Amino acid sequence: MEIVCEDFQKVLTKIKLLRENANIIEETVQRSVREIVQNVRESRDEALFFYTKKFDGVEIKDVRVSEEEIKQASMFVESSFLEALQEAKKNIISYHEKQKRQSMFDCTSKGIIRGQIIRPLENIGVYVPGGTASYPSSVLMNVLPAKLAGVKKIVMVTPPRAGGIDPHILVAASLAGVDEIYMIGGAQAIAALAYGTESIPKVDKIVGPGNLYVALAKREVYGIVNIDMIAGPSEIVVIADETGNAKYIAADLLSQAEHDERATAICITTNIELAKEVEKEIERQLETLPRSEIARESINRNGAIFIVPSIDEALQLSNEIAPEHLELHIKEPMNALAYVKHAGSIFLGPYAPEPLGDYLAGPNHVLPTSGTARFFSPLSVDDFVKKSSFLSYTEEALRDVKHHIVELANKEGLHAHAKAIQIRFGEEE
């Protein structure tokens, strides 16, 4: 891992280049994704079966997972796994319950009523990855907020493997309350949820992380359906001062690097000695990681340790990066929280490692990446509701303000708007 001692702007330039390189890859893949989406839109199930055989190496005739298969899945998982899943579910629910909001209205003495109705989406599709790793935790993180919001129908898609779907995924789906599960993955699954096929129902919104093909397919169908966000490769930034523990920091950086060769792992520190220790620890820990090949490629391609003169500058740099995950391994991390403007999720102190948020603590692990934490937020109950405004005026209330409406409408050249007000008071011309 490279240790960089350069000024602020040079560091930002390096990070910008990393993201631009990722965009070049995206442009190449986008053409392929567009073709897949169009074929599924036109050929429906036929295209689904074709792409499943082509990309997953599995020949299927029926994409729906049966109720019997879901029930039997519990026979193939460990009791310790089920206990961990139950604990995670409890924490996710307790955290997200506090996000629920109520419809509201206000009224005045003249009989003006204004308000907002909050309603759950009717149906959603959840994408659960199933490539180089299986993610039961993603099932809980995507489904439970939707259940709390009151979504009526939740459909899940996940790539098939030889022999079916990982039983841990099926158990998590059953525990979370998924209504229907389909063995389909990749861009073709996103297209099926967006347009519907003979087997898979069209949904109103698609959520859940996936690989580059999945992310670009979500971008392609946005507007036909709603989506949560365009999620890129995983990212972590660790800010550390001289109190940082090199073993902890290295382990946390590698926890993200092992996701994907395109993942980004950055340490920003004020202490050169700590930087050297972190570098050594990364090499040492890589030797024992089962996914060391992926993690090493990620570290070599997108990893760096930046030396800065102060924690203030470290925070400033982090705000420019706007990382998915930010860890603060510094004295009094809570005091620094107010200065963090842009980050998907923030982890304070040495005993709040990023995997705690990935699995168990309760806050959602579906987070904005690639700098989009500047304007996107973690997945929440709000993502599964929609809002409608309503208003009611009495004749007297409208009469009091009609001249303002007419003035504004005429200024915009929308005279029928003005007339719609005037006609109610015999002022037609």
Swiss-Prot record:
EC number: 1.1.1.23
PROSITE patterns referenced in this protein's UniProt entry, alphabetically: HISOL_DEHYDROGENASE (PS00611)
Signal peptide residue numbers: none
Binding positions (substrate): 234, 256, 259, 325, 358, 412, 417
Active site positions, chain numbering: 324-325
Claim: NAD is one of the keywords in the record: yes
Cofactor details (free text): Binds 1 zinc ion per subunit.
Residue sites binding NAD(+) per the record: 127, 188, 211
Domain of life, per lineage: Bacteria
SUPFAM superfamilies assigned: ALDH-like (SSF53720)
Co-factor(s): Zn(2+)
Any GO MF annotation of the entry: zinc ion binding
InterPro entries for this protein: Ald_DH/histidinol_DH, Histidinol_DH_CS, Histidinol_DH_monofunct, Hstdl_DH
HAMAP family: HisD (MF_01024)
Protein family (similarity comment): Belongs to the histidinol dehydrogenase family.
Chain's role: Catalyzes the sequential NAD-dependent oxidations of L-histidinol to L-histidinaldehyde and then to L-histidine.
Descriptive protein name: Histidinol dehydrogenase
Source taxonomy: Bacteria, Bacillati, Bacillota, Bacilli, Bacillales
